[in-house]
Amino acid sequence: KALKGIIIGIILVFSIGVVVFLGLSVYAYSNLKYYSVYYAQQMPHKEGTEPDLVMLLENMGSIYTPKIEGIRYDDDGGNAIIDTKNNFVLSETMGNFSYHKYHFSVGFDSTFRLHHVSDFTGEQPKREIHEDEIKQEIREVFAPVIDAQPKPRINLQWLFNKKYQDRFN
């Protein structure tokens, strides 16, 4: 009888431990996704990479997407944020990112480094394309979405850094 009680106690303690572990794991996963833009803004990263813009698009289904006049979110297929006033589109498809503006498209790699530029008018570009200027424009256009991202109540910055540090360095 005593052995039976010990076995039941061990099973109960083990079961509670598993449930607590699973609960904490789900919470940590959800926290890292929902607050990913905030964490990415705080994370040290190599110059030229843009972790906050990457997280904005990669985790669009999990982050806070405020209702902002002139901004539309499209997660049908690849993720995209659309400035409907100016018809600018920032999108993510299969780990790469694009910024579309009029007859002009800029492609970025998985860390948001400039990959290619396409001009669909067939004309020669009137001036050289500067990566920093394009990124600054993207930040200005989509700043309302980035600025609206909340700060986490329980900060798991260390865990976010551990997961993404290598990608952005």
Residue ranges with predicted function:
Residues E69-N169:
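Extracytoplasmic electrostatic interaction patches
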Residues G5-Y27:
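Hydrophobic membrane-insertion alpha-helices, especially the h-region
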Residues K4-I8, Y27-V37, Q41-Q42, V54-E58, ...:
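Polar/charged alpha-helical tracts
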Residues V19-H100:
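N-terminal export/targeting and maturation segments
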